A protein has these predicted regions:
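Active-site-adjacent loop/helix segments that line or gate small-molecule/cofactor pockets in enzymes
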Residues: 13-36, 53, 84
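Glycine-rich loop-to-alpha-helix module at the N-terminal edge of alpha/beta enzyme cores
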Residues: 19, 47-132
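Short, acidic, Ser/Thr-enriched surface-loop or helix-capping motifs
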Residues: 42-43
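PLP-dependent aspartate aminotransferase-fold enzymes
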Residues: 95-180
Length: 180
């Protein structure tokens, strides 16, 4: 028996129109229209504390005037180019980050998933460069790493992985706080 997707269930319960978005998350029955700082407002005007600060790539909260102005100013000059070209602002930021972190280089990503995917590749590359034929990467049980094939394979949730087998091998799962 096929289970009804969660959004269809809530649409039926709340009388919401079905969305044309692919149902990849079990969405909650709330729609946000705007935010300010750590607060978000839904389409009914109810205000919530956003304890996640916008989650993932928006960790600075919502609608900060200086950030909005900086984004608008940059969008008015140049929004994005390929990494095939040099970008002075990107290089200036890389200089600052490497100085602060005491590192030699940085790798800018569009998402946490892309960052995790790059970390997996770098770890495997390092292993191969040091004579390890099948490098293994330690990941935490029940952790979420992303939805690409490699990051999904690293994710410690069988429910999230179901239906996408065969998964990428080379991950060793350990429980949190187990230092042995």
């Amino acid at each position: 028996r096929r289970r009804e997707p969660p959004f269809q269930f809530w649409s039926r319960i709340k009388g919401l129109a079905m969305s044309h978005l692919m149902n990849t998350y079990a969405r909650l029955p709330v729609a946000f229209s705007h935010g300010d700082g750590s607060w978000v407002t839904d389409t009914d005007g109810k205000i919530y504390l956003d304890a996640l600060s916008g989650i993932a790539v928006s960790t600075l909260g919502h609608n900060h005037p200086e950030l909005v102005a900086a984004i608008a100013a940059q969008a008015g000059r140049l929004l994005h180019t390929s990494n095939l070209y040099r970008m002075p602002q990107q290089e200036q930021l890389a200089d600052k980050l490497t100085a602060l972190a005491g590192m030699d280089e940085v790798f800018f990503c569009n998402s946490g998933c892309e960052a995790n995917e790059a970390a997996i590749k770098l770890a495997r590359f390092y292993g191969h460069q040091h004579g390890v034929d099948s490098p293994a990467i330690i990941v935490m049980e029940k952790a979420f790493h992303g939805r690409t094939m490699a990051t999904l394979s690293a994710t410690g949730n069988r429910k999230t992985q179901a239906g996408f087998e065969p998964l990428v091998s080379g991950f060793v799962r350990v429980p949190y706080n187990d230092l042995d």
